[in-house]
């Protein structure tokens, strides 16, 4: 081999080391990167497809729709959570408690829509953005000796708001009007039982902790809820946590239901959190991992039952 030829060869090899090899590595790295992206994208869409096809699971609505409806000349507001799809779906009317600003109940909305239920949170008169006077202010205006009776009177009047909410829900194209449940916590549990006296065509009643905070001090309320259980027009599942303010609602109303041979179940769960309020409102609104499967099983049974 000629010396100049060898020299040229070494120079060419140096050029290849400087340019050709890095260029090849860059191309190779890009090919690997794009293959990786395609693989990840395929896995994502396959996972999304499997999730969409899974039985009993729906894509949860990220935000509810704020709606307006009327009750007794008052403009009431509420929040409507809907599963993905056209429906018609079974639905739940959720009765909030005594809080001034009930909100949209996002934990419950997500839970129920993921299981293919429309979830409606109507705000009764004087609460949230709804017109009217706040029930707690009206109770406080009564003489102390009359407050227990006054609270029951006001609760009875607010049943009209729940019925208006139910009628609004039945009018929605996404809702199956023959598969509606009424539920709620605390004051909302009271509303659930009082509304359940009416023959409104609902499939079930699921009261959480009805009157538990005021039970011991309010004999008129005790008597009224006993009567509501006697007159109930739908099966009842009453739920409380062991550290609620009082477990008397479960015990007294269960005894009455058994005596009258009503379609009634009650369940007391282990303590939730550390305080009475944790076991009361916290349990109702955020412990879906504790009571959720039991409620869904109860609702499924009632949805299948013939009226």
Where are these regions (language model features)?
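The feature captures the conserved acid-bearing segment of alpha/beta-hydrolase catalytic domains
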Residues: 204, 210-265
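Alpha/beta-hydrolase active-site loop
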Residues: 140-172
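Bacterial N-terminal signal peptides
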Residues: 46-55
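Short substrate-entry loop that stabilizes the transition state in hydrolases
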Residues: 87-89, 97-131, 214-215, 246
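C-terminal catalytic histidine-bearing segment of alpha/beta-hydrolase fold enzymes
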Residues: 263-307
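N-terminal cap/lid segment of alpha/beta-hydrolase-fold proteins
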Residues: 61-85
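Alpha/beta-hydrolase
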Residues: 95, 122-124, 208, 269
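Primarily recognizes the serine-hydrolase "nucleophile elbow" in alpha/beta-hydrolase
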Residues: 160-231
């Amino acid at each position: 081999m000629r010396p100049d030829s060898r020299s040229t060869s070494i120079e060419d090899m140096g050029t290849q080391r400087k340019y050709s090899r890095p260029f090849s590595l860059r191309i190779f790295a890009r090919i690997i990167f794009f293959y990786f992206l395609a693989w990840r994208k395929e896995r994502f869409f396959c996972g999304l497809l499997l999730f969409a096809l899974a039985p009993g699971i729906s894509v949860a609505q990220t935000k509810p729709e704020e709606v307006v409806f009327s009750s007794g000349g008052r403009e009431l507001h509420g929040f409507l959570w809907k599963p993905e799809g056209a429906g018609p779906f079974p639905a739940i009317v959720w009765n909030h408690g005594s809080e001034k600003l009930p909100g949209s109940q996002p934990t419950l909305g997500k839970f129920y829509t993921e299981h293919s239920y429309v979830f409606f949170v109507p705000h009764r008169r004087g609460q949230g953005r709804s017109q009217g006077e706040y029930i707690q202010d009206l109770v406080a205006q009564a003489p102390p000796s009359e407050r227990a009776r006054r609270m029951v009177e006001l609760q009875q009047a607010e049943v009209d708001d729940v019925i208006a909410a139910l009628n609004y829900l039945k009018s929605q194209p996404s809702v199956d009007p023959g598969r509606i449940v009424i539920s709620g916590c605390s004051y909302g549990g009271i509303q659930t039982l009082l509304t359940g006296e009416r023959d409104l065509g609902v499939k079930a009643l699921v009261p959480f902790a009805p009157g538990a905070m005021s039970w011991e001090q309010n004999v008129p309320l005790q008597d009224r809820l006993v009567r509501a259980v006697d007159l109930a027009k739908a099966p009842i599942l009453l739920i409380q946590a062991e550290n609620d303010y009082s477990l008397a609602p479960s015990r007294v109303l269960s005894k009455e239901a058994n005596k009258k041979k009503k379609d009634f179940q009650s369940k007391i769960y282990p303590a939730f959190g550390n305080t009475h309020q944790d076991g009361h409102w916290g349990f109702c609104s955020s412990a879906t991992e504790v009571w959720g499967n039991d409620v869904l099983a109860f609702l499924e049974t009632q949805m299948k039952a013939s009226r």
